[in-house]
C-alpha cells in the first residue's frame, strides 16, 4: 500500500469522535467512539498504517485536544487543526468574525458546497443543533444554534418538575400523555427551526430555486421523518469536508 497519500481525518465533537482513514480516493477504515471513552481509540488506531497527514476538527475543548495529541503522538505526524476562515475551498463566510465560527460548522459547509454547488441548508443535529445557510454562490449567510434533542429533553425533565418521566415517547400531532408531549414538543421545536430557516433561505434565493437540505449528526435520523422539505442525510459530512480541505492544501506548493 502506498501510504504517502493517507489522511487520518478526525471529527472531535461534543459527544463523540468520528474518524476515517482516506487514501485520496476512498475510505479505507472508519470508526466512532464516545468522548468519554476516547482513550479506547488507541486500540483502533494501532491497527492502522501510519498516515502521511492528520487533520482534526475539534470542538470538544482543550482536554480533548490534548488527549488526541497524546494518542496520535506515536505516529510522529504533524497534526493539522481545522479552523474557520473568511474564504476556503469555494465557500465565503459572512460571519462578523469568521474565525469565531465553530470549525465543525465551517468544515460541514465546505463539504455541503462541494456536494451540491447550490443554495442549501446544513443541519447538524448533535448536542446542539446548528442550521446554517449557504447561498447559490457559496456564501455562508449565517445560521442558528439551538439545543439538540437530548439536551432539550433533559432540560425539560430536569427543570420543568417532570423528574419521574423517562426521556422517551413517540410523536403525536396532539399528544395525550406527558411522555409523548415532551417528545413531540422537542420534534416540533427542532423541525420548526429547520423549516423556518428553509423558508428564509428560499425567500432570499427566490422562490423559483429549489433549496436542498443536508442533515447530519447523531440526531439526523430522528428528525428526518418529520421534516417536510427536500432533504438528505449525510452521516459523515465533517469527515468529507476534512478530506476536501486536505486535498486543497496538498495542491498548494509548500513555501518557506
Curated annotation (Swiss-Prot):
Its main location: cytoplasm. The keyword Ribonucleoprotein does not apply. ATP binds at residues 11-18, 127. One of its GO terms (biological process) is coenzyme A biosynthetic process. Pfam families: Pan_kinase (PF03309). Its cofactor is NH4(+); K(+). One of its GO terms (cellular component) is cytoplasm. It is found in: Cytoplasm. Substrate binds at residues 95, 102-105, 178. Pathway: Cofactor biosynthesis; coenzyme A biosynthesis; CoA from (R)-pantothenate: step 1/5. It comes from the Bacteria. The keyword Oxidoreductase does not apply. SUPFAM superfamilies: Actin-like ATPase domain (SSF53067). GO terms for molecular function: ATP binding; metal ion binding; pantothenate kinase activity. It catalyses: (R)-pantothenate + ATP = (R)-4'-phosphopantothenate + ADP + H(+). Its EC number is 2.7.1.33. K(+) binds at residue 124. A monovalent cation. Ammonium or potassium. Keywords: ATP-binding, Coenzyme A biosynthesis, Cytoplasm, Kinase, Metal-binding, Nucleotide-binding, Potassium, Transferase. The active site is at residue 104. Homodimer. HAMAP family: Pantothen_kinase_3 (MF_01274). Belongs to the type III pantothenate kinase family. Catalyzes the phosphorylation of pantothenate (Pan), the first step in CoA biosynthesis. This is Type III pantothenate kinase.
Amino acid at each position: 500500500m502506498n501510504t504517502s497519500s493517507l489522511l487520518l481525518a478526525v471529527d472531535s465533537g461534543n459527544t463523540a469522535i468520528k474518524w476515517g482513514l482516506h487514501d485520496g480516493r476512498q475510505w479505507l477504515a472508519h470508526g466512532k467512539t464516545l468522548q468519554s471513552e476516547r482513550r479506547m481509540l488507541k486500540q483502533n488506531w494501532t491497527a492502522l498504517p501510519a498516515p502521511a497527514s492528520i487533520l482534526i476538527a475539534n470542538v470538544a475543548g482543550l482536554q480533548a485536544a490534548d488527549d488526541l495529541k497524546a494518542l496520535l503522538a506515536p505516529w510522529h505526524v504533524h497534526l493539522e487543526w481545522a479552523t474557520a476562515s473568511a474564504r476556503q475551498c469555494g465557500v465565503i463566510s459572512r460571519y462578523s468574525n469568521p474565525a469565531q465560527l465553530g470549525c465543525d460548522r465551517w468544515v460541514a459547509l465546505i463539504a455541503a458546497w462541494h456536494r451540491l454547488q447550490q443554495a442549501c441548508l446544513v443541519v447538524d443535529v448533535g448536542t446542539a443543533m446548528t442550521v446554517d445557510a449557504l447561498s447559490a454562490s457559496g456564501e455562508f449567510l449565517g445560521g442558528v444554534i439551538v439545543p439538540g434533542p437530548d439536551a432539550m429533553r433533559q432540560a425539560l425533565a430536569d427543570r420543568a418538575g417532570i423528574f419521574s418521566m423517562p426521556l422517551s415517547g413517540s410523536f403525536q400531532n396532539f399528544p395525550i400523555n406527558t411522555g409523548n408531549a415532551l417528545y413531540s414538543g422537542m420534534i416540533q421545536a427542532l423541525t420548526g427551526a429547520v423549516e423556518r430557516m428553509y423558508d428564509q433561505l428560499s425567500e432570499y434565493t427566490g422562490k423559483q430555486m429549489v433549496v436542498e437540505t443536508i442533515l447530519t449528526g447523531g440526531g439526523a435520523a430522528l428528525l428526518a421523518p418529520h421534516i417536510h422539505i427536500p432533504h438528505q442525510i449525510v452521516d459523515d459530512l465533517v469527515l468529507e469536508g476534512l478530506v476536501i480541505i486536505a486535498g486543497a492544501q496538498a495542491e498548494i506548493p509548500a513555501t518557506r
